[in-house]
Structures are given as C-alpha cells and as structure tokens.
A protein has these predicted regions:
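Helicase motor core with emphasis on the C-terminal RecA-like subdomain
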Residues: 2-4, 8-12, 16-17, 25, ...
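C-terminal or mid-to-C-terminal helical accessory/interaction module adjacent to the motor/catalytic core
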Residues: 344-397, 406-409
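Residue-level detector of conserved catalytic or cofactor/ligand-binding positions
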Residues: 589-606
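Residue-level signal for threonine
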Residues: 24, 125, 182, 496-505
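Short alpha-helical segment immediately N-terminal to, or the first helix within
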Residues: 33, 308, 373, 571-572
Length: 610
C-alpha cells in the first residue's frame, strides 16, 4: 500500500483520472522513483498495474511521456482507453496515413499530448528522433522489455537499438517494464538498454486467483469443450494452439458447438486479424483461438481462462500466456492438455531449428524446465515461482497437484524395459523406431510391422504386458521429460542419452507419476467465473449490470471493461449503492461518467427483483 498523502500529485492523478483510491504493491515506489527523475526496471505480473507506473509519472512530470511498444495492432485501443479517461494520447506507427501522422506531430510539438506511443523500429528513424528533440519529454517507457533478450521467446532486434534513448536524452528518466523475466533476463535487459544504474522493482510472480491445471491429452478438443461448458460457459477466454491449421480446426469446432470463437494467426489477412481482435476486446464472452502471435499487451481484464492445446516451448512463455487470464483479480483458470506427442514434436523442432549448437542447447533447457513443471508431483504454483527465483510454501490449494495429488511410483524397471528395447533395436538390428513400434514390441503385439522386421525375435518382445498402452506411452513421455530418452530425425525416432546407461546399469532410480483417476475441477468443483463467490441473491444483479455494461459499451464504441470491469460490477452488486455518494465508495467508481445515473437505475431495478 502506498505511503502517499492525499496531497501527493501522483495519488491525486490515480484517484481523479483512473478512479482508484490507493496504489497496489510496488506501484507507489516505482512512480515516486520515476517522478523524481530516476530510472527503473519493473517486473510485475500481468494484471499488476504496470501501465500506471509510467502513465501517472507522464501526467505528473512536465512534457510528454514516450512509450515504446512492439504492439502496433493494439496502439489504437490503448489510445482510445486513455482518451475515455480524458488523457491526451496518440501514437506514431506505420498504420497512419501521412495526414494523420502530421496531425500527431503537430500536437506533440504544440505540447498537446500527455502520452505518445511509438514502435521500436520508429526510433531508428532520424526524422522521429529529430521530432522528439523538438518537445519536452517527461519520460521514456520501454514496455515488454524482455523483447531485448536474444535468448528470450519474444526477441525483437529493434529493441537492441533503444540504448540510443539514454545517449541522446541522458537527463530523461527511463522505465523498462515486463511481466516475465528470470534473474538472467533481468541482467540482460539492464545491460542492453543501458539501465545498469536503474532501481529494480521485482513484484511477486504469484497470481493467486489463477488455478493451474495440466491434464493428460486425450481427444483435446472434446476436453476443451467440456471445460468451457462446465466451468466457463459464456465467458471470454484464449485457446492457444501450435499450428495455424489447429487454430482453424479448433475455432470451427467451438463454433459448431455454439461457442463464440474466432481464429487468429499470422496467415490470416491483417484486416481479419484486426476485426477478430476488436471483437474479442469489445464484446463479452468471445473465445479467441490463436497461435502465440496473439496476446502480448492484450488489456482485457475479464479473460476467465487460458487453455493450451499444445505444449508451450518454455516456462516464460507459459507464464506470460496464462497470465492473460484474470487480470481483474477474479477466479480464472490456466488449463493445459499435455501428451507424449507434444514432447516428441518439441524435441524435433529443437533439433531442426535454426541457429548454432549453443542456441539449440538453450532451447532444450527451456523445454526441460517446462516438462519438469508438467511432470511434477509437487505444488505447480511453487515450482512455477521457483523457476523465477521466488519462494512459495507450497500446498497452494488451487492447482491440480494440490487439489488431487498424483501418486509417485518407482518406475525404474519400466524405464529399463523401454531403454533396453531402444538399445537392442539399435545395437542388434541397427534400427531406430518411434514410440508406437517400441510400445508394440513391449506389449508383444503381432502386427505386420513387427513381423516384417522380425521384432518378435527380440528378447524384450512382450516383456511389458504388466502395463497398458497408455501407461507405456506415459512412461516414455516421462523418460523424455527427464532426459533419459530423446528423439531424432523427422520421424521422431527414440534414441538413448548419456544418462540412459545409469538406469540400465541400475545406478539410478526413476520416479514417475500416476495421473489422478478423475479430472480436477477448478476450486474443488466450483465454477471459476466472474460470478464465483458472490452470494446467490447478488448474482442476478451482477448479470443485469453486465448486460447494461454491454449496451453502454456498444453505444460508446469502446470495450466493455472501459465502462466498468467485472471486479467493479461485483462490488456494486454486493454493495447495492442507492446514491452517487455510495457508488463512489465502490473500488473503480471514483471517476463518474454520464452513465452513473443509468447504472444506479440498474441497481434499483435489480434490487427490486431480489
């Protein structure tokens, strides 16, 4: 909580412009640093209020705040959201016509802008740099600062040029912000952006309102439909798929089943992507099915779930993508369907990726950490936070491993059977095969392929009849995750690793996990929705307020959350204010609009129906 007094200009802006009564977490300290001319490197989880950390100093300090952002497609929405609050904001990027660009430039030079958003590539232009020389600059904000990391999952080469900001304007404070960075990535950001002297602010990475669940993949589109129908009916969410074809197929399946779903991937025309993104942001209950091309910078507070139908490449990517759920602090779900084919596919992608051996090793380390998170029998939240160097006592009570702890078992003998089969195929026959053939050999199946290669003559043929096919596939998946097997080639053939010999020589025990018999539901079976935890009598009013908000948003041509967020509507439904004065006591309602009287009428009607 902030220590600011009522006369603090920053606190005054927070209340008067943004409608909040107090700062959260590190916000006050960050803002104080920048307002007083200091540099800052800010790590704050999605939904933690990063934007206020540069927007408020830009409004308090003289001059215009310049925000460097890679999110060209979202700049219009960001500017519109600020304009709705009375903030003078504009953007410069390649989408503007010459006439519109000149209008923005005139406004900037005339001192008529509080915030100017620019793309990083724009700062490589001498014309843009000369333009900024002609106006007082309040600060430089470098958003999505992890894009400067050459080892990161969102590397943008143009970010490497941003050290020019300090060289050209040494007295202007800079603030670099990201939601995702390990200690090594933080150090790289500071080095490459010339921020070694900046004060670091590292908030907790914990998102306690998100329930983390990773399930064995089995007909994933049906699993997804079950999740949406039972826990998130009519709610906004994001579904991530690895390929464009999977995006199109999944979106079509959802639409066929009565769900408002839209596709988003780089293969779609820019106009279609823009239209689908606009619908997702502005309408309630839309599900976006997308590749990872979608999501960075999406400022939609009421995303109730993020689902992955394919394995993310890294923990950083997983954390950033799941962090797009529940920005409003209300209960939300991060759900991942994960199977053997995911591991094989990701290993193949690494093997065939561009770059040198060091780059591939780094990709492998990222994947290993993601696989460890998937296969853990401990609290997933604790392991996720540990990856970012933060401690958690565990037993969070809101991840699948805490709600239904999986059993661990000694899988050493099973591992030896798999590894021995791979070894004998290679050593005795000079052959390499994928998972399916290895499992058929272990189960002693009389298939055409087994007979053709005379695999029934191997000593390991049929030694695995103590486990089912699915159980053997789970064993192979966990061996791949633990680095005791790897895959090679376009066909994903299984190959031993240096560590395999320790298991075959009985010098290493292999622990494995049994999956729970029944799927885990969010919050011990309760619906993880915006209406969760509301008293039953308050739910009708909450839904009435959401309907009123949808109408207002459509009339004003703005996203619904710009009118009021779900958290604010929950507060109103609970408090049932009967006057503007009482409405002002609800968090998020300090800034009144012309809609306030209409909203009170909605409350009165809802109260009569109680």
């Amino acid at each position: 909580m902030a220590t600011a007094t009522a006369t603090d200009p920053a606190l005054d802006v927070l209340r008067r412009v943004f409608g909040y009564d107090a700062f959260r977490g590190e916000q006050a300290a960050v803002i104080d640093t920048v307002v007083n001319g200091g540099d800052a490197l800010v790590l704050m989880p999605t939904g933690g209020g990063k934007s206020l950390c540069y927007q408020i100093p830009a409004l308090v300090r003289p001059g215009t705040g310049v925000v460097v952002s890679p999110l060209i497609a979202l700049m219009q929405d960001q500017v519109d959201a600020l304009a709705a609050l009375g903030v003078r904001a504009a953007f410069l990027n390649s989408t503007l016509s010459s006439e519109d660009r000149r209008a923005v430039e005139r406004a900037l030079v005339a001192g008529e802008l509080d915030l100017l958003y620019v793309a990083p590539e724009g700062l490589r232009s001498r014309a843009t740099l000369d333009l900024l020389d002609r106006t007082p600059i309040a600060l430089f904000a470098i958003d999505e600062a992890h894009c400067v990391s050459q080892w990161g999952h969102d590397f943008r080469p143009d970010y490497l040029e941003l050290s020019v900001l300090h060289q050209r304007w040494p007295s202007v404070p800079r603030i670099a912000l990201t939601a995702t960075a390990t200690a090594a990535t933080r150090a790289e950001i500071a080095l490459r952006l010339d921020l070694e002297g900046a004060r670091h602010f590292v908030s907790s990475f914990d998102r306690p309102n998100i329930t983390y669940r990773i399930v064995p993949k089995d007909r994933p589109e049906k699993q997804l439909l079950d999740l949406l129908r039972t826990e998130h009916a009519g709610e906004a969410g994001i579904v991530y798929c690895l390929s464009r074809a999977s995006v199109e197929r999944t979106a079509a399946t959802l639409v066929e089943n009565g769900i408002q779903a839209l596709p988003y991937h780089a293969g779609l025309p820019a106009s279609v992507r823009a239209a689908n993104q606009s619908r997702f942001l502005r309408e309630d209950g839309v599900v976006m099915v997308a590749t990872i091309a979608f999501g960075m910078g999406i400022d939609k507070p009421d995303v109730r779930f993020v689902a992955h139908l394919d394995l993310p490449k890294s923990v950083e990517g997983y954390y950033q993508e799941t962090g797009r759920a529940g920005r409003d602090g209300l209960p939300s779900t991060a759900w991942l369907a994960y199977g053997l084919a995911d591991v094989v596919q990701q290993r193949k992608l690494i093997e065939t990726s561009d770059g040198d051996a060091a780059h591939r090793r780094n990709l492998g380390r990222h994947l290993d950490a993601m696989l460890a998170l998937c296969e853990t029998v401990e609290c997933r939240r604790a392991q996720l936070l540990a990856y970012f160097g933060q401690e958690h006592p565990g037993a969070c009570g809101s991840c699948d491993t805490c709600l239904a702890p999986p059993e661990a078992w000694d899988g050493t003998v099973a591992a030896q059977k798999v590894l021995s089969t791979v070894f004998r195929l290679d050593r005795e026959r000079g052959q390499r095969f994928g998972v399916g053939q290895v499992v058929d050999i272990l189960l002693g199946r009389d298939t055409e392929k087994v007979r053709r290669f005379r695999h029934q003559e191997l000593s390991v043929f049929g030694v695995g009849d103590d486990l089912s096919e699915n159980e053997w596939r789970a064993v192979v998946r966990q061996l791949l995750a633990q680095g005791l097997l790897t895959v090679e080639g376009a066909h994903g053939t299984l190959v031993l690793t240096a560590a395999s010999g320790e298991v075959l020589a009985r010098r290493r025990e292999v622990r494995m996990r049994h999956e729970p018999a029944r799927p885990v539901r969010a919050a011990k079976g309760r619906k993880a929705s915006a209406a969760a935890e509301l008293a039953e009598a308050d739910v009708p009013l909450f839904e009435a307020l959401r309907a009123w908000r949808a109408g207002e948003a459509k009339t004003q041509g703005v996203p619904a959350y710009i009118v009021f967020g779900d958290a604010t509507l929950r507060g109103i439904a609970t408090a049932r204010p009967g006057s503007l004065e009482r409405l002002a006591l609800v968090s998020g309602c300090l800034v009144f609009t012309s809609d306030a009287a209409d909203e009170l009428q909605c409350v009165e009607r809802g109260g009569r129906r109680r």
